[in-house]
Curated annotation (Swiss-Prot):
One of its GO terms (biological process) is cytochrome complex assembly. This is Cytochrome c biogenesis protein Ccs1. Keywords: Chloroplast, Cytochrome c-type biogenesis, Membrane, Plastid, Thylakoid, Transmembrane, Transmembrane helix. GO terms for cellular component: chloroplast thylakoid membrane. The chain crosses the membrane at residues 19-39, 78-98, 164-184. May interact with CcsA. InterPro entries: Cyt_c_bgen_Ccs1/CcsB/ResB (IPR023494), ResB-like_domain (IPR007816).
Amino acid sequence: MVFSTKLYTTKLLKKLADLRLAIWLLASIGILIALGTFIEQDQPLAFYQENYPTTAPILGFVDWKFITSLNLNTLYSNIWFFGIVGFFASSLLACTYTTQIPALKKFRLWEFITNFKSLRKFQLKRQLPRNLASTSVYQLYGKNYHVFRQGKKNYAYSGLLGRVGPILVHFSILFVLFGSACGALGGYTVQEIVPRGEIFHLQNLVKSGNLSKIPQYLSWRVNDFWITYTEEAKVNQFYSDLSILDVKGQEVKRKIIFVNEPLVYNGVSVYQTDWDILGLKLKLNDQQTIQVPLNKISKSGRNFWLGSVFLDGNSKQKITILLNDLTGNIYVYDNAGLLVATTKLGQLVVFPEDQSLRFQEFLTTTGLQLKEDPGLRLIYLSFFLVMVSIYISFLSYSQIWGFEKTDEFILAGKSNRAVLAFQEDFKKDVKEILNTLKFN
């Protein structure tokens, strides 16, 4: 019973390790990924109804009903997609277990040549005096060869590490697959628009995996927000001063972030993505402080912010406020649309009938994207293994055999890479072995 179970397991592993199956699975994954690139993922239903209407289906059948019925809009989190990826991972593991690891073990074993005729197939060989057989063992050992001797036969190999490359490639692919699966199941993305000085929790969930956990024990505070400009008055960079608070409101980490410089804490990365101006805080007649909301208007690729306020209670003196950016210039227009003042924060603007105002502060918001991907480290590890495997794959695996006859000693060798370099090293080794005769 145990024997039949073991035999069945061996047959199953060999079928899983079949190269044709692995190629077919890899091609299927590639096609699905390409399909996921073509069809936008994780969008609202209205998006697919608008872009893939039933009145004009692509190829005559691809419409929003077709996409949603097959879950092509959430391709990378589908159970059947994970099934194919898992099947491919099983094929790689089976190949590693049944082919690569046994081959590596075989290369570690000695492989003696038992007769002189077997040496004829080697192009690289040399006849030496019979008494140099033992000398060759010490010479090769000093060249970092693993040397074995049995009776009149020698065997040596070097560069076994180069044979580990295929195994590392397999594991790097496995780590990519597992890392991607962990990210899809346990990761999430949150988008937040937060006014300066406000404290917020993660609420506006854009994307999340079935096993993701949002850290509600943390809160976040936007301490400050500002923008730097180029000499041409174009946005150079925008910054957010962020703090992470624990359940007691104590600050556990603080950092100034900007584009491509996120804040990272316990696997959560906070990226700077956008910004906006909500309004202006101003003081009327040096008495009443009010907040004026501003509306964002985009025209010809530029953004403007407009707002209005009445200077008196009779609603007669209405002014319009215009902002181009946060450089400090504020443009004030009257009821007729005429520019009456260009001012900055803190400056007093005087109007007829003893009316005045003073702009005090910009009310800004910062756009933040918060992400957690638990599989990211596995993916980084896979890239590292790929680089290591590329490096060690260039290491030559060299083998040298020795066979003693009645009156001579035959030395032969071969290498899987850098054949010319191995030939030169082989000739050099033979020369050094012969040189030992001069000292004896």
